[in-house]
Regions:
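Short, low-complexity, Lys/Arg-enriched N-terminal segments of secretory-pathway carbohydrate enzymes
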Residues: 1-11
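Edge beta-strands of extracellular beta-sandwich domains
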Residues: 784-788
Length: 794
């Protein structure tokens, strides 16, 4: 199958002709595949992904495996086993607030003069965890997805990879490929949204960036770990078609196109069997059918007992060592993996399974040139340099999504606006014992007070600094001689102080209200919740503040920091709304750049936004203390008494559900405004053996330069039954100067044109009928569409 060639944007017909001819020559020379066979082939040497700039040589799997075999050949069994389990239960790391979250110890085999330098694994998706502020605290992956900028996503991965490389970290535990099945999902901010195709593309670009820096990426959490409540004792019930079409597709993509080096099994069970001992999903599907060649590592403490089924089912590495918090967990217990030699002697585990696991781990390290001359672990190496900080600010700005701009209230015009009010505790410094630690929630400190630049859990980092919205706006307002007033105190009930806020801001020319919601992993308590959100309501009763202020001043802009959709009962009462997500350490500068027009907003929503009851799926949610009591008695980790999550919605997640049920959301998938006006026209599409080639003309009819995102949706041929009405299958971001136009080229490859057939137990490309192609700036725009016939000989 062919991966997309690098997109071009141009107004020159000659360049288009030359480009088209070049593409045809390239495509003819490459062998294409039309379905996933027993082992998915490696991607073509020339592809969109391989055309990205890199400065690191990556070996082929064949060469890596040969080197690994020679390395392992003289080693006794106990040395091979030592490669399969961690030696740090993370207590040391967390207490010091610095260090690897998982590691393999180095060793020296004297008889063969064999040296192994060890392996360091570390979180995560927003930068180097436990780095004590010596590296960038990045935006959330959900913000990354908001940019819809392929080159930007790759560069984020590349710079993050370089930071990990400098510190001697072999494996970065990212990206998270789970789907925002429910907007309440606690770790939704760690992923790339609610659409499998978008997650596939974003994940692959991120993986390529990381691994082009010489660091192993880790695709997680395999699979169906789409909620936090009872995650260690839950059962995701997913039918075969849905499993392959939605939940395995992103993993297939990062393996096929990203060549990802490692995959992490999740805590939950799928169809009754916990993932770390699910032979069907790990060994048969991931390794054999999909053709994954790297190593499989458990999520931390996802080994629940001493059953040899875990390693026999295909798991290669147990992290951080020992079994998990089962009924008799004893802290540093490593009994299971460290005594694998007993299982081999008792013939419960075959020695060739040990050999295979060790081979996969060492081969992956050889592939990324980590076996010789790799940096020693040193978390104090500073990568928080000016260049990286400047880029993080750009990402923070580019990931803001403008949702409403009535009367062009934005950008702030300093000829009109002389006084700004900044309200809402989310705009100001945080109230935590350690202001740089975003996992500061305890029973004594259960409320989140202050700005939310990131969620909580293993995905966060220790911030060296944080530019709050108040700081960023105040600094920028001074340049325009605009007065700033503010109020950030909460009442004793933990609510916004409405009376004082009104008094301070009533005569302001514009009121900026910062509102937030917070979520994360289940092991941390915040606002009475353990991970998943209770509701989509914003914190601290800020809805009441917004409504009351709107009665006396209509010039209100609400900026939302949240892990996804929130309720907007005041939507029609304010003039401006911005979704800012979790933008990282440069949050305040990024939002100031947008508010004052220094950056034209170009972000788009990577999820559909509506009321809780409108979505396909919900999450069983109880108070945190009630969940803990129930779990201790009935649903301990790895318990056979599982909480069931039935994925009965089938293929209809995200925008697809709203299309099926004809529900009009508050904001469609892909929605996002700009300070200029874009128009799309001249949709053309041509079906070829390699895939579908689409062209769209993008015109900037406004007075400001800007970037536009073209989204492509497809309706599959009618005979593909019980399939979504439209599926998202392509996008590109193009920069267009004011008064000019460009032609946006989008390629949809063979795999993306395929659907999973339960009849043939494989992905199949339609051989008859026609596709309907839709082009627009969001799922709600259907102005441009055309039909393309399928050719049977493809």
């Amino acid at each position: 199958m062919q991966t997309p060639p690098q997109p071009l944007s141009s107004t020159s017909p000659n360049l288009i002709l030359i480009t088209t001819i070049s593409l045809i020559i390239l495509l003819i020379s490459i062998l294409y595949y039309h379905s996933i066979k027993t082992t998915i082939p490696l991607p073509p040497k020339k592809s969109y992904y391989s055309s990205l700039i890199k400065n690191y040589t990556i070996l082929s799997w064949e060469s890596s495996y040969e080197k690994a075999k020679k390395f392992l050949e003289p080693l006794p069994l106990k040395y091979k086993i030592s490669l399969l389990y961690g030696t740090d239960n993370m207590l040391e790391s967390s207490q010091k607030n610095i260090g690897c979250v998982g590691k393999l110890d180095p060793f020296f085999h004297k008889e063969s003069n064999t040296i192994f330098n060890g392996m360091c694994l570390n979180d995560g998706p927003t930068g180097v965890r436990f780095s004590n502020g010596t590296s960038i605290s990045w935006n959330s992956p959900l913000n990354t997805a908001c940019t819809f900028d392929k080159k930007l996503v790759y560069k984020i991965g590349k710079i993050q990879g370089m930071e990990f490389y400098e510190k001697g970290i072999n494996t970065i535990l990212s990206p998270n490929l789970n789907i925002m099945r429910s907007p309440l999902s606690g770790r939704a901010w760690e992923g790339f949204g609610d659409d499998p195709y978008l997650i596939s593309i974003m994940g692959t670009l991120f993986v390529k960036g990381i691994q082009d820096s010489g660091v192993i990426a880790n695709a997680k959490h395999y699979v169906g770990n789409d909620q936090e409540t009872y995650r260690r004792c839950s059962n995701s019930i997913i039918d075969e078609r849905n499993l392959w079409e939605n939940y395995l597709r992103p993993f297939i993509h990062v393996i096929k196109y990203g060549d990802v080096g490692s995959v992490m099994t999740s805590y939950n069970a799928v169809n009754g069997i916990y993932l770390s001992k699910n032979r069907k999903l790990v060994l048969e599907y991931l390794k054999e059918k999909i053709g994954f060649k790297g190593f499989v590592v458990t999520d931390w403490w996802a080994i629940y007992d001493s059953n040899p089924d875990y390693i026999n089912s295909g798991v290669d590495m147990n992290m951080p060592g020992g079994k998990a918090y089962g009924k008799k967990y004893t802290g540093r217990d490593r009994s299971y993996w460290s005594y694998l030699d007993n299982y081999v002697r008792n013939r419960k585990v075959k020695e060739k399974r040990i050999d295979d696991a060790a081979l996969r781990i060492i081969a992956t390290m050889y592939k990324f040139n980590q076996m010789d001359n790799f940096n020693s672990v040193n978390f104090s190496r500073n990568t928080n340099n000016d260049e990286n900080i400047k880029f993080q600010r750009k990402v923070a700005a580019d990931s803001n999504v403008l949702l409403k701009n009535e009367d062009n209230i934005l950008p702030i015009n300093d000829k009109i606006v002389k006084k700004i009010a900044i309200l809402g505790s989310d705009a100001f410094e945080r109230d935590c014992p350690n202001e740089r630690d975003f996992n500061c929630y305890t029973p004594k400190n259960p409320h989140y007070k202050g700005h939310s630049p990131i969620g909580y859990g293993s995905g966060t980092t220790t911030f060296k600094y944080l530019i709050t919205p108040y700081e960023g706006i105040l600094k920028r307002a001074k340049k325009s001689n605009i007065k700033v007033v503010s109020h950030n105190k909460l009442t004793e009930k933990g609510e916004e102080d409405i009376k004082t806020s009104i008094q301070i801001s009533k005569d302001s020319d514009i009121i900026l209200i910062f509102a937030h919601s917070i979520s994360g992993e289940e092991y941390i308590r915040s606002e009475g919740s353990c991970g998943d959100r209770f509701s989509l309501t914003l914190l601290h009763n800020i809805d009441s503040l917004i409504i009351e202020l709107s009665k006396i001043n209509k010039n209100i802009v609400v900026i939302i920091n949240s892990p996804g959709p929130v309720n907007l009962p005041w939507k029609d009462k304010v003039k401006g709304i911005i979704y800012s997500g979790y933008p990282g350490s440069e949050s305040g500068n990024g939002i100031a750049d947008i508010l004052f027009g220094d950056v034209n907003p170009s972000g788009h929503l990577p999820f559909v936004w509506s009321k809780r009851e409108d979505y396909c799926c919900d999450i069983i949610k109880t108070k945190c203390n009630e969940t803990e009591k129930f779990r201790k008695k009935y649903r301990y980790n790895g318990s056979p008494n599982m909480e069931e999550y039935k994925y009965s919605e089938g293929l209809f997640i995200g925008q697809r559900w709203f299309d099926l049920k004809r529900i009009k959301p508050i904001f469609n998938f892909g929605y996002g405004l700009s300070y200029t006006k874009f128009t799309f026209k001249n949709l053309n599409a041509e079906m070829k053996e390699s895939g579908l080639f689409v062209n769209v003309t993008v015109i900037n009819e406004g007075n400001v330069d800007g970037s536009s995102v073209v989204l492509i949706f497809l309706t599959f041929p009618n005979y593909v039954s019980n399939f979504p009405i439209r599926v998202f299958k392509g996008f590109e971001k193009v920069f267009v100067k004011k008064g000019e136009s460009v032609i946006c080229h989008i390629f949809i490859d063979d795999f993306s044109l395929s659907y999973y057939s339960v009849e043939v137990n494989d992905f199949v490309r339609p051989k008859k009928g026609e596709f309907v192609v839709f082009a627009g700036s969001s799922a709600g725009i259907e102005d441009l569409k055309l039909s393309v016939k399928v050719k049977a000989d493809f």
